[in-house]
């Protein structure tokens, strides 16, 4: 199957792809991997894929106070799952709750898949109800394997749905927009994951616990960076006399081991040892575990062994092709691109994707590309390699129609971070390079707001003239702007002393015009922060302080509501040096602004609150209290 990978070669996949990137590598000393090719498949009565060694040994974890018991485990059968004493036949009241739980699971899946934003957001109300229902001990003891699996899968799916939807949006998520619930929705999701984890760790679901449920849970925890909690849950579970075997199944190991290695919970040699012990009797270990081991080997710099793992995946797919095995191949291929420090190897795998020369499909995920950009720049003295990878990635995403907004944002953010590191000073070469990069991007795809936002954010040259030229590109390329770009431009003026108060006020007015056209009826805190950074937090605060307080006095009642006013002043109470001046806006009825600020005619922006009334008590309390250290 894996032939003709190269257009001019008919060797195996290894000869056309793998051997080209082989370089002299010193493989860390470790026990050899299982390479058994016995024709007789081992009959393993252990349903959890655990090595039932007769040696009662303990594997002491690096940087951990606990020990993972890798001795023989009690074999679990379905009969045990059905007859465990924790299971209780539900009474009538519990049956009613159980049916409601089932209905909520169905409703949750329907709302999660809904294209309508309102329906999708209603999902989190359902999820919160499900999480609260699990607090009922009788209900927990009435759940079966299928229901627990459905619930864990719902949590797992919600994380991906939430992040995909948010990253695809063009709008900015302001936490002061109370009607924009994506922030609070994520709080609900995080809480549900932690609540479920606590119940699992307490042993509440032993009678219906499976490796798939555990995989979903651990992966969800890792997504939210609950790393310590997840690893502790796993380590404690391994040592559980009843369900320890579940924690050593391939799906679980594939989820845990990469993160454990990343966090230095285990050394590379210890990881290999765990793998060998749990796959010794298997001719072909599970493809997800092989993928995980390949990625760990890459991170450890053991590229020779990583290539061996890739070849094993190819062999396994060749014997029995499935979509899941293809996904594993793709995942490990991406790891060679983003995690490999040998740029020649990484480039080879990158080019195979760009040139579409693979017998399997690889979606070029941006985090791996940004990592590749970083590695390429760190490995060389110039930006040449990084430019090659960036240009080809931009063109690839455009050609394959993979134009998720966040994809370009992440890619461009990393690239221009590196660009201004490589060219910290403005000169003829750096200016020409930046101009050529902008031209390339505009010729490849329509120039967008996030692209210009990224350049302006990272712009570090001292020239105000060039910065103004960059800002003019929004109009030159007819870019559709949101309040985000206006905030970025306004904030950027704080880094340059050459901007006059009139110029800053003009940018503030442009910002308000955009808010008004975007049907905002209030000025969000994000805009107040941008004004602050452009004035009293600028490199010349003495020249711009009066402007800030004058604008604040003029537009103070344009905040969203009393809660927004209190939040705004609350931030200033933590900064005693500014508190007295801020207090004047609240306490002086006849405050005289030093700078004249004219209010244009708005269609949507309006006064919403009496700022002085909303903040008076907080200001008085803050002034009377002792300054915070």
Curated annotation (Swiss-Prot):
Domain of life: Eukaryota
Topology in the lipid bilayer: Peripheral membrane protein
Signal peptide positions on this chain: none
Segments of this protein annotated with the region Disordered: 28-57
Keywords: Membrane, Mitochondrion, Mitochondrion inner membrane, Phosphoprotein, Sporulation, Transit peptide
PTM comment, free text: Phosphorylated. Phosphorylation promotes binding to RNA.
Subcellular location: Mitochondrion inner membrane
Transit peptide stretch: 1-62
GO CC field: mitochondrial inner membrane
UniProt record, GO biological process: sporulation resulting in formation of a cellular spore
Low complexity biased stretches: 34-57
Subunit structure: Monomer.
Its biological purpose: Binds the 3'-UTR of mitochondrial mRNAs. Involved in the processing or stability of mitochondrial mRNAs.
UniProt family annotation: Belongs to the RMD9 family.
Protein name (record): RNA-binding protein RMD9, mitochondrial
């Amino acid at each position: 199957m894996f032939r003709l990978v190269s257009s001019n070669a008919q060797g195996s996949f290894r000869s056309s792809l793998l051997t080209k990137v082989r370089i002299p590598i010193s493989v860390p000393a470790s026990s050899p991997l299982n390479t058994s090719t016995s024709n007789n498949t081992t009959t393993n009565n252990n349903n959890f894929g655990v090595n039932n060694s007769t040696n009662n040994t303990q594997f002491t974890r690096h940087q951990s106070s606990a020990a993972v018991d890798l001795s023989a485990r009690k074999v679990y059968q379905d009969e045990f799952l059905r007859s465990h004493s924790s299971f209780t036949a539900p009474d009538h009241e519990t049956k009613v709750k159980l049916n409601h739980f089932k209905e909520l699971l169905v409703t949750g899946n329907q709302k999660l898949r809904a294209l309508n934003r309102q329906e999708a957001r209603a999902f989190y109300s359902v999820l919160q109800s499900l999480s609260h229902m699990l607090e009922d001990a009788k209900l927990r003891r009435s759940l079966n394997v299928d229901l627990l699996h459905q619930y864990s899968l719902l949590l797992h799916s919600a994380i991906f749905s939430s992040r995909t939807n948010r990253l695809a949006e063009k709008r900015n998520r302001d936490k002061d927009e109370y009607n924009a619930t994506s922030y609070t929705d994520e709080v609900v999701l995080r809480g549900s994951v932690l609540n479920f984890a606590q119940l699992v760790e307490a042993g509440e679901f032993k009678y219906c616990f499976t490796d798939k449920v555990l995989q979903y849970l651990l992966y969800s925890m890792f997504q939210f960076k609950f790393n310590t909690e997840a690893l502790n849950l796993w380590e404690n579970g391994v040592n559980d006399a009843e369900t320890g075997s579940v924690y050593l199944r391939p799906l679980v190991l594939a989820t845990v081991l990469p993160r454990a290695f990343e966090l230095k919970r285990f050394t590379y040699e210890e990881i290999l040892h765990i793998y060998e012990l749990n796959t010794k009797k298997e001719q072909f270990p599970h493809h997800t575990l092989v993928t995980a081991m390949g990625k760990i080997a890459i991170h450890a710099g053991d590229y020779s062994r990583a290539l061996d793992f890739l070849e094993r995946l190819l062999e396994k797919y060749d014997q029995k092709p499935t979509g899941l095995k293809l996904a594993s191949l793709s995942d490990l291929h991406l790891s060679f691109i983003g995690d490999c420090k040998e740029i020649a190897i990484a480039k080879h795998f990158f080019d195979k994707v760009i040139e579409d020369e693979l017998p399997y499909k690889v979606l070029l995920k941006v985090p791996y590309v940004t990592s590749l950009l970083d590695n390429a720049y760190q490995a060389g003295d110039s930006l040449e390699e990084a430019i090659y990878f960036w240009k080809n990635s931009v063109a690839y995403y455009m050609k394959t129609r993979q134009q998720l907004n966040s994809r370009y944002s992440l890619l461009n953010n990393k690239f221009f971070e590196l660009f201004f590191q490589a060219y910290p000073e403005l000169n003829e070469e750096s200016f020409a390079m930046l101009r050529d990069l902008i031209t390339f991007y505009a010729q490849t795809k329509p120039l967008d707001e996030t692209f210009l936002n990224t350049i302006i954010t990272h712009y570090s040259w001292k020239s105000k003239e060039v910065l103004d030229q960059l800002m003019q590109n929004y109009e030159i390329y007819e870019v559709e702007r949101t309040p985000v770009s206006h905030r970025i431009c306004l904030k950027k003026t704080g880094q340059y002393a050459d901007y006059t108060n009139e110029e800053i006020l003009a940018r503030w007015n442009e910002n308000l015009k955009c808010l008004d056209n975007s049907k905002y009826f209030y000025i969000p805190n994000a805009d107040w922060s941008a004004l602050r950074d452009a004035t009293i937090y600028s490199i010349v605060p003495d020249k711009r302080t009066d402007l800030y307080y004058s604008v604040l006095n003029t537009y103070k009642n344009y905040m969203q509501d009393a809660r927004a006013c209190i939040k705004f002043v609350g931030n200033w109470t933590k900064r005693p040096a500014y508190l007295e001046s801020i207090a004047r806006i609240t306490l002086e009825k006849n405050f005289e602004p030093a700078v004249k600020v004219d209010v244009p005619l708005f269609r949507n922006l309006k006064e919403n609150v009496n700022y002085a009334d909303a903040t008076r008590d907080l200001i008085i309390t803050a002034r009377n209290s002792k300054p915070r250290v």
